[in-house]
Amino acid sequence: MSKTQPIKPRMAQRATLSFGIVASQYNLAYVQAMADHAQNELNQLEPGASVALVWVPGSFEIPVAVKVMAAQRKFDAIIALGVVFQGETEHASLIANSVSMALQTVAMDHTVPVIHEVLLLKNEEQAKARCLGAELNRGIEAARAAVATARTIREILPRF
């Protein structure tokens, strides 16, 4: 696990951004913590930003909800949050691979940043370290990546 977080973007200087978060209800305690941290970080970095949080039953359902949000063209970036634990079978890997590919496809098809924090973890210890703490929380990382990428795209668009 990386011990460093992405650089915290500067405070907003102009029009606020709009963010979507799609979160899995499965392994709720971990995902809820990531969602809370992501929302708090988005509000700190982009005061007044619009943040829409949508819950889906499990990680496999995240991409379709992300696609619906992306198709609306109302969001500058969308964050996907979930926790999948590896078990004795290949099921978790199949879910993780499918979700990863689908999220990238949505991002490319709709030209919207999709920040992928659907975590494939070995155990609860890894989940606690990545989801519950404030120091290396993946929700915070997702929010920082969403803000930085959305701002970059806003800078690029007028040039072309």
Language model features with spans:
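Glycine/charged-rich beta-loop-alpha catalytic/anionic-binding loops adjacent to active sites
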Residues: 19-20, 50, 84-88, 124-129
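Short beta-strand segments
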Residues: 23, 80-84, 115-119
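Glycine-rich oxoanion-binding loops at beta->alpha junctions
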Residues: 54-72, 117-119, 123-125
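Glycine-rich phosphate-binding loop
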Residues: 65-103, 160
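C-terminal binding/interaction regions
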Residues: 17, 92-160
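Residues at secondary-structure transition points
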Residues: 25, 29, 33, 49, ...
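Glycine-rich phosphate/diphosphate-binding loop of Rossmann-like nucleotide-binding domains
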Residues: 9-53, 57
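Short gly/ser/thr-rich secondary-structure transition/capping motifs
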Residues: 1-5
